[in-house]
Amino acid sequence: QAFGFHSASLDVRQNSAFHEKALDQLLRAAGLLDERSFIDWSVEEKRALLDRELRSPRPFLSPGISAGPEADTVLACHRVLAAHIHDFGTSGLGSLIVSMTRRVEDLLIVYLLAREAGLAEWTPKGLRCPLPVVPLFETMGDLEAGPGIVEAFMSHPVTQNSLAALREKLGGDPSFQVMVGYSDSNKDCGIFASQWALHRAQKALSETITQHAAKPVFFHGRGGTVGRGAGPTHWFMDALPHGSLSGSMRMTEQGETIAQKYAHFSSAVYNAEILMASAASATARHRHAKPQALAVEHILDGLAASSRDAYRSLLHTEGFMAFYRTATPIDALENSRIGSRPSRRTGQASLDDLRAIPWVFSWTQARFYLPGWFGAGSALKSLRDERPADYKALAGALRESAFLKYVLTNIESSLVSANANLMRAYAGLVPDETVREAVRAAGGVALERCTPVFM
């Protein structure tokens, strides 16, 4: 109330596919495309064009020429940023976040669009961008590819020029930010596989960034429920991989959790204290304590793969989407106006296009809480039955590993919240008996396997 937004900085976030479409329109307007779209080019062709163009200061088009809706939208945004920097500097501006980053070309395209808008600057050493371009890794595949993408991006001349300018300005090592998505990775492969992929990715990304004389700063895109990455803040900090917290971090707070945590003075003080104290404590451990290798990593690799397979087998069960659309209130959520973003990324009626927010919310409303537990029980039961020695080793590691304690406790809380009677009642809304029984049977078996393992 006293300061409003005066001390805040503004991030700009856009989907990689939107950027690619914008560049395609620019290239076509400049007469640099034949019948083939830039989107259809091979990765090698795209990289060759990007490297060539990023060595040149000239834009594609003269000012005032429209290239297409996506191109005009991105360039208008970047021109506003360039004007702000010209008048006031970079204070108040954050990062250019690229959601659904799949490959390094998704990040280099942003440099080229920034050059076109006059946001990127030409220096004697080449092009540099005054605002950091930040990858957002959201799916399991992208998290696994993340370290390689960041390595290629940080080795690129434009990124090196940009980091060198920051290093000179700060008089020390700059920070390099990476955003990791908890919601979409969970929707992609289930909670256990998602959490393990995030843990491994942050560890590998930290090592990659440190090798380039920069400090890793992770932006944790967490939601307000376990299925979207939520959990006790201090446990979350304790569970972060060693070296991933260097004194600075970011995380999202959802609208509903902001009111819950900070609407009243006493709760605001309590939650702010937990956040700052746990961040300071974890940073001190990461700086001064020696990293402790997790002895059961190979077991967790297999457990994650098993839980992912169980989760995806449910999603690929014949008739699953028909069951989902009838047994949950997803149709009401899609037509509601309560969210800040549309329920689907591009409007396509597919599971891949559905955002994680309505996905988790709909299962919660039907009291399945499926994104918070499905797949974990099946994987643990298989481990216990087929490899009892590994299961015993995992149980022993639970007493020592903050990561395991955090993840399994969150899964347990989701399992306790699920209501089997209400699940059966909602499943009864599905008119096709074959579909209803096939999906309900898969969910019921998973719940039965989960319960004795966790309870």
Predicted regions and their residues:
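Acidic/histidine-rich catalytic neighborhood
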Residues: 225-249, 253-256
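A short acidic (Asp/Glu
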Residues: 21-23, 104-112, 144-148, 188-191, ...
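Conserved, mostly hydrophobic/aromatic
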Residues: 4, 135, 224
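C-terminal structured domains
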Residues: 136, 148-151, 186-195, 201-211, ...
